Amino acid sequence: MKPATGLWVWVSLLVAAGTVQPSDSQSVCAGTENKLSSLSDLEQQYRALRKYYENCEVVMGNLEITSIEHNRDLSFLRSVREVTGYVLVALNQFRYLPLENLRIIRGTKLYEDRYALAIFLNYRKDGNFGLQELGLKNLTEILNGGVYVDQNKFLCYADTIHWQDIVRNPWPSNLTLVSTNGSSGCGRCHKSCTGRCWGPTENHCQTLTRTVCAEQCDGRCYGPYVSDCCHRECAGGCSGPKDTDCFACMNFNDSGACVTQCPQTFVYNPTTFQLEHNFNAKYTYGAFCVKKCPHNFVVDSSSCVRACPSSKMEVEENGIKMCKPCTDICPKACDGIGTGSLMSAQTVDSSNIDKFINCTKINGNLIFLVTGIHGDPYNAIEAIDPEKLNVFRTVREITGFLNIQSWPPNMTDFSVFSNLVTIGGRVLYSGLSLLILKQQGITSLQFQSLKEISAGNIYITDNSNLCYYHTINWTTLFSTINQRIVIRDNRKAENCTAEGMVCNHLCSSDGCWGPGPDQCLSCRRFSRGRICIESCNLYDGEFREFENGSICVECDPQCEKMEDGLLTCHGPGPDNCTKCSHFKDGPNCVEKCPDGLQGANSFIFKYADPDRECHPCHPNCTQGCNGPTSHDCIYYPWTGHSTLPQHARTPLIAAGVIGGLFILVIVGLTFAVYVRRKSIKKKRALRRFLETELVEPLTPSGTAPNQAQLRILKETELKRVKVLGSGAFGTVYKGIWVPEGETVKIPVAIKILNETTGPKANVEFMDEALIMASMDHPHLVRLLGVCLSPTIQLVTQLMPHGCLLEYVHEHKDNIGSQLLLNWCVQIAKGMMYLEERRLVHRDLAARNVLVKSPNHVKITDFGLARLLEGDEKEYNADGGKMPIKWMALECIHYRKFTHQSDVWSYGVTIWELMTFGGKPYDGIPTREIPDLLEKGERLPQPPICTIDVYMVMVKCWMIDADSRPKFKELAAEFSRMARDPQRYLVIQGDDRMKLPSPNDSKFFQNLLDEEDLEDMMDAEEYLVPQAFNIPPPIYTSRARIDSNRSEIGHSPPPAYTPMSGNQFVYRDGGFAAEQGVSVPYRAPTSTIPEAPVAQGATAEIFDDSCCNGTLRKPVAPHVQEDSSTQRYSADPTVFAPERSPRGELDEEGYMTPMRDKPKQEYLNPVEENPFVSRRKNGDLQALDNPEYHNASNGPPKAEDEYVNEPLYLNTFANTLGKAEYLKNNILSMPEKAKKAFDNPDYWNHSLPPRSTLQHPDYLQEYSTKYFYKQNGRIRPIVAENPEYLSEFSLKPGTVLPPPPYRHRNTVV
């Protein structure tokens, strides 16, 4: 053992250590490599260890635990599950090693190049402290390396461990366990551990996952049978046979699935026969597949690396740092003369020229003076070796200036700068960026790549032998018009021409830098690279080319060289070859046919035919083939497949097929005889029953009769206005229903069956009518009637604001957290109602939820819904189109639909709401959705959702249907969240957001454009009968409600008498301060049962009536005719009872319930009626919406606008401003009721009744209206949503605590 000596490594690693999060949310931390070195301060040593590994699950490196005292808390190590390097435990004094969740040690690095697990010298020599137990009870895999356990004085049970089961390569040299471990005081393993354990109890038994497996298993297992083998990609054991059941992965973990390799960056497209970019690609980061590398890593091919290799350079593409191969030499920036590390240098000389090796960019200047070229004896600098000047051949840019005042006499040009492209001129030498002075040996410049001199002037003078300079058009190199050229006292042009020092004939008139075709500024005809040529090698030459303008480009290497005057290629790439050199795959020439290339969903194998063209192998060939049929598949012995030749296996296959068919015939005949005998027996029994005149039902189901009524409408009562959309069987119109003999107009939606449909469509259409007529719930669209015209027509309520998907998309900037959570509750309650009636919706989505008002949504489109019989648990669908992206996996694969598959669709619907109309799996083809779901991928977490809301969605998307929550649980969960909306949804500006006015909806405006709203009446207003006028009570303080009144059946709300002089009257969904104004009260006649919710979430929701608008003007009372009371009855088997007189006052001064009224179970919300209710006698005013009007005729005042401010439960309206008035409003709390308010989630007292009001012109039950003071304003409470617990059910004398949460749009 050689202890490391670099103590500084600790400090540097402490600074560099960080934790990143891979895609599967596992915490990853960096390991250490200090071996036995430790800090001198043991306290600091412990703190460093804790800082490294607290909350760490995967250690990317080595886990080293050394020099820890006996009294230290090491419980933070329980989070470690995987170590990629080695585990070292040495020189410690603690008793127990708490690595209880460590499952795998990969051993990518080994201690002493040999051991993956090293445990030694863990005791104190002068004391009784030391390691006694290894808490490695879940360690089942060491992929590489051995185990060393030695010199642990107090260690027990280590010699009982079956290390050969843990170590993948258990060679004897890899296992070192000597007898110096342990003492005589060690106990025995528990009797259930069969002699192998990590500790004394039954929880410390060793789990064997390899040596107990069946011989057919090629890896780990979870039982002794053949069916208990783990997937071959599993490491450390598993809980099932799938690749998602592994405890750890042998190679890579891809979102919970163990795979051989991560999804590659490029996949083979069998349609285009090319490798294409894979949008689902992931990068390997350790043993994980991640969508994005950590910020301090770069992408090299398909892996995350700390730095690019020497042959690649780091570039950034689309925000991703990547390693790209260098075309020639990798970019390298170096300091120039007078900058950075060469700040004190005056010239390039032999002492600093090596600093320019492999430099491509010079940040600064290059200066060549006599003291650098010929040496400086004064400073002991030798003359420069001319060969070393070739280091400048890699330079492509000089940001400053180039100053050459001295040059080796044996060099006649500056060809070492042949790759110089740009002289930046950011720093100038007396205004010059290029200076060449008094170089007598220079004959040509040879700056053949120079394209730009960005700034500064040119000065070339006193070079007596320099030619070619006069042929160059220097202005083409300049970037500004202010640059100047000073060229003089060089060799005369005529002398140069006389000696033949002229440009090559292939150069253009732009000139040249020197002799030869490679020194031209541009070519007269064609160019190949930098060299000008006469013509391209189209038909001859060693390398064949094609012409791309004036540039000759070499053909692809896969093109075969053609003879006899034929072109080898017609353009770039392997798809433009005249003939392929090797093989042809589709239009492309390839070196070999695809053999195991990764495709979109599988690996691609192809074979070559005699014409050297590639063709796909048979689908059964999973490892390659030699021909097109399944007989040509290639099999390998190690795969477990038969290696017999095909002709030898054919007789066996034929015999097996014949034997199988014979057995099938025998089984079929036996089954037919059994069915026939059973049928005969059943007929005989039935005949005996009929002969005895049995009057009892033969098959009583126990199911209650369906007593819903179906209204038959005449075609003359319906008027179509405009088309709203089309469905599977017909078209939906906006229409008007004018009941026969009446003058009211009711806006409806009319669904008409297409005339071309057949009998089956008629049956399914009427089945839909049956389902809709049987459903009666506030959050389900109601069927009004059926018209049996030649084309069947279904008439339903018209939802004025369209579907919820378009509504949230249109108003996404105005929708807050309260409204979103209220919608979630309402949809869950509607689906809970369907589940109680054994109805599977099958097409739940935001597009199939309609908006009656901003606070009220309803589920529609029962076109796919199916009722389950009493003994059915699932529905098996036949053909037809299905909304794949909203469906559970079992629905896609097996077309099995249950209530739990509706829960999956509910999760997707909630995701649509939280993304304000986002498209699920946008951009992913539908056919790829099943594979995506099986791999564990789900919709991402919406930006506004907290982890609490997103986890509810994730639970809805569990593969196991029984693991998904019930709608009853979902309603309770979202009810709880809706009590504190801003805790669960984070929306910018939520506090300042106003609810969108229904009148602003584009869908709503389109509905109102084409129809006069005179005599318009809402459908529910028309159907629900009216009660007698009841003068409303006027009060300002809290009224008393007996909590005993909210039993299974509820009585109508009692009336209350005024309790102060200041009177408030509720009109049209708002309150107005008036004196002595009476408002009619409508008694309910139909009971809509509310499905129960989970314990602790049984409270109703009561919203502020002014949430969506301001106070209303007073409206004159109105009563409809008595005939309307006969229009609808909740129970068609019972006649409407006689109306009883008004209730009487009890002994405490409260109004007693009216007799013979149908009992109500809860209060209906007061909702906006978007249509106008106006009578011809003028007794009602036209209302656009009762919750969106001001109390005054003028424009709304600033103080009347709705603002999102918290409402406090213990603040009340003090209209009199007197102390005694406030005193009357304070309630006292009984002792037994105090505990119920410690946590508002557990308020479980009874609730007040709620009446069914479907028209906003009438008074909401006044027993539920209380007033609170909010910043000096008085606002009423209206039962808008039955999801919030109100304080009504408190007994008299109860004092409410301060509000624990802040709510928007709702008063708790």
UniProtKB/Swiss-Prot annotation:
The keyword Kinase applies. GO terms for cellular component: basal plasma membrane; basolateral plasma membrane; cytosol; extracellular region; GABA-ergic synapse; glutamatergic synapse; mitochondrial matrix; mitochondrion. A motif (PPxY motif 1) lies at residues 1032-1035. Residues 1117-1150 are annotated as: Disordered. The chain crosses the membrane at residues 652-675. It is a single-pass type I membrane protein. Disulfide bonds join 29-56, 156-186, 189-197, 193-205, 213-221, 217-229, 230-238, 234-246, 249-258, 262-289, 293-304, 308-323, 326-330, 503-512, 507-520, 523-532, 536-552, 555-569, 559-577, 580-589, 593-614, 617-625, 621-633. It comes from the Eukaryota. Residues 26-651 are extracellular. Changing residue 1301 to F: Abolishes interaction with WWP1. A motif (Nuclear localization signal) lies at residues 676-684. It catalyses: L-tyrosyl-[protein] + ATP = O-phospho-L-tyrosyl-[protein] + ADP + H(+). Changing residue 1275 to W: In ALS19; reduces autophosphorylation upon NRG1 stimulation. Changing residue 1000 to A: Abolishes APC/C-mediated degradation. InterPro entries: Furin-like_Cys-rich_dom, Furin_repeat, GF_recep_IV, Growth_fac_rcpt_cys_sf, Kinase-like_dom_sf, Prot_kinase_dom, Protein_kinase_ATP_BS, Rcpt_L-dom. Expressed at highest levels in brain, heart, kidney, in addition to skeletal muscle, parathyroid, cerebellum, pituitary, spleen, testis and breast. Lower levels in thymus, lung, salivary gland, and pancreas. Isoform JM-A CYT-1 and isoform JM-B CYT-1 are expressed in cerebellum, but only the isoform JM-B is expressed in the heart. A motif (PDZ-binding) lies at residues 1306-1308. Tyrosine-protein kinase that plays an essential role as cell surface receptor for neuregulins and EGF family members and regulates development of the heart, the central nervous system and the mammary gland, gene transcription, cell proliferation, differentiation, migration and apoptosis. Required for normal cardiac muscle differentiation during embryonic development, and for postnatal cardiomyocyte proliferation. Required for normal development of the embryonic central nervous system, especially for normal neural crest cell migration and normal axon guidance. This is Receptor tyrosine-protein kinase erbB-4. It comes from Homo sapiens. The gene is ERBB4.
